[in-house]
Amino acid sequence: MQGFNMGKYIPPEGPNAKRKFDKLRNVIRFEMPFPVWCNNCENIIQQGTRFNAVKKEIGSYYTTKIWSFSLKCHLCSNPIDVHTDPKNTEYIVASGGRRKIEPQDINERPAKAENDEKVPSDAIEALETQLTQQKSEKHNSSVINFIYEKNERLWSDPFVSSQRLRKQFRERKKIEKKQEAKDLSLKNRAALDIDILPPSSSDKDKALLLLDNELGKNKFIRKLDYRRTLMPSSRTFSTFAKFAETSFAKKDPFARKFVPSEKLRSEQRKFPTENLKGEKILEDNSVSLVNYEVSDDEG
């Protein structure tokens, strides 16, 4: 008699797929070979800390395999990958962290020659190398002599040189204090609690672009003189009428005619002019034009 569920087909993506995948992974006990800084939590993982790492082969150096150890930080669960380096016989942190440099690591490194150049293989190459070195030494000698002569010329009289430097420092200090006062007044006016950096060329270009854009949007507003519109004179109304005919008429061809009231007519008779044209009327957030004439004969 067959048992329960015997002979039943279970697909690879079934409920046992995860358990099968876990069996394929090579999980080992890995010990950190050196101190490592975590890039996520900025904490240090000390040397000798042990982890459950996934070991897998990622390449080879000649016939030596290169292994990768994937682990997670014990403080923030940040994934860290450590690879073997067969060429230099050490480990490297590939991602997720960085190695902490210690003094003993510097002392253990092999010393390198100051002029780590390849040895010439023949006499012609050796001669070319010698000529190049002589040319370089001659150039360096001329530069050193120039610097020495310049220092001797500038500091031939220490008192005059010191006086000149103090004068430059005083002028620079005055400029800095003046700029600091300007920045402080700006911070007080704008209620800022940040440091104001000196302006740059890019800031100036951006400000000009913003200004041009803003002036372009408000072109018809800039033409209007608000001080003159507030003055109770006929010249004000005539100026605004001329502006309204050239500006608002183009934008609103279906402007409504406005019939002035009796009170407005009585006020307009006080003006010394004969013709009054144009007045802006705002009703329900809309702009309407006025184009009418009032003569002295009307009663």
From Swiss-Prot:
InterPro entries: Saf4/Yju2 (IPR007590). It is found in: Nucleus. The keyword Manganese does not apply. One of its GO terms (biological process) is RNA splicing. GO terms for cellular component: nucleus; post-mRNA release spliceosomal complex; spliceosomal complex; U2-type spliceosomal complex. Keywords: mRNA processing, mRNA splicing, Nucleus. Its main location: nucleus. May be involved in mRNA splicing. PANTHER family: SPLICING FACTOR YJU2, SPLICING FACTOR YJU2B-RELATED. Belongs to the CWC16 family. This is Protein saf4. It comes from Schizosaccharomyces pombe (strain 972 / ATCC 24843). The gene is saf4.
